């Protein structure tokens, strides 16, 4: 009897001590620091187990800040449930079902520490040295939404077209969601970069004095959606794999048609312009399509020849809507391939990303014995080789004609960057073992690039 009583007292004592303990094993503790320790421990376990990290907002410090903002969280909730609760706004973002739901955006999460810096950057959104990679980090991966919304406001489009700001933000969020973050290059950050470049071109004196609010609206929407739902492979890949998109668009501007139709779908789904007459909405959709279709790199010579012809004759009249639309098409084409026109630090990052996407396609083609597309074989190609050919045969001819049309400081800056970046890549190329055959290789590949590649 005495021994039994002692054991009972010992068990009661152990239970009482356990209930008072703090730290990673205390699920009854109301101490937020203890909950944070448990959360960090769970993150470490997930990383060791090989779980794929979430694309955005998964940093423990961000989660911890959200935890502090939730004053009504009960202390008895387990660490696992806390993590689920804190991540729910990310799950909402990935679900089309909840697109209209009111949730705390990641921008709100970062207001205190980062949003001030992001706003400061937006004050210089017209600067050609704008660092879209830094801006994307400061906005927690929401660069496309933040930048485009700001530009709509900056150009007075919200007031002019009487846009519902909730619908506008929802439309921009849908656009951003429909870009694939797993694409190294054709993702929402690229779309944001192109949109920022388009804004710079719209500010150029010739355009700024002639474009209408309608022109600006179409240009910004087309820039933001020009690669919408890009699969990360090029048109020839879709054709040789009998992809349904190639069949649907009869092997002609397959990706560009898909980007355009996807943009139209989001425009209609958002209801952003539902207050406009049907004729205006139809005209908007058609003109956005004409802008996006102009980014098909296989039609580069067609657009460039027409533009050059007008410049030679001196008959471009920007009071003519058709001529103005052609110039906007050329502006979007420039914005789409302006990476070599940025400073070396930015340009090099873009070069590495697009080459990674090329090589990923080549890896798939090798795996399934499809025949590797030009510029997509990581065993025979190099970033330097691809970039030098790209600049020589596509970028320089386009931006030379653009400088004829708009001979400004920006145009000379862009051409200057192309020259410097090309020289830098040539320097790196000379260090490569196969550099002797580089000239012939990139000339051939660049001609093929114009016809079919560039993952446009």
Swiss-Prot record:
Gene3D superfamilies: 3'5'-cyclic nucleotide phosphodiesterase, catalytic domain. Keywords: cAMP, Cytoplasm, Hydrolase, Metal-binding. One of its GO terms (cellular component) is cytosol. Pathway: Purine metabolism; 3',5'-cyclic AMP degradation; AMP from 3',5'-cyclic AMP: step 1/1. InterPro entries: HD/PDEase_dom (IPR003607), PDEase (IPR023088), PDEase_catalytic_dom (IPR002073), PDEase_catalytic_dom_sf (IPR036971), PDEase_CS (IPR023174). Interacts with CBFA2T3. A divalent metal cation 1 binds at residues 190, 226-227, 336. Hydrolyzes the second messenger cAMP, which is a key regulator of many important physiological processes. May have a role in muscle signal transduction. The gene is Pde7a. Its cofactor is a divalent metal cation. Composed of a C-terminal catalytic domain containing two putative divalent metal sites and an N-terminal regulatory domain. GO terms for biological process: cAMP catabolic process; signal transduction. It catalyses: 3',5'-cyclic AMP + H2O = AMP + H(+). Belongs to the cyclic nucleotide phosphodiesterase family. PDE7 subfamily. It comes from Mus musculus. Binds 2 divalent metal cations per subunit. Site 1 may preferentially bind zinc ions, while site 2 has a preference for magnesium and/or manganese ions. One of its GO terms (molecular function) is metal ion binding. The active site is at 186 (proton donor). Residues 110-432 form the PDEase domain. Widely expressed with highest levels in the skeletal muscle. This is High affinity 3',5'-cyclic-AMP phosphodiesterase 7A.
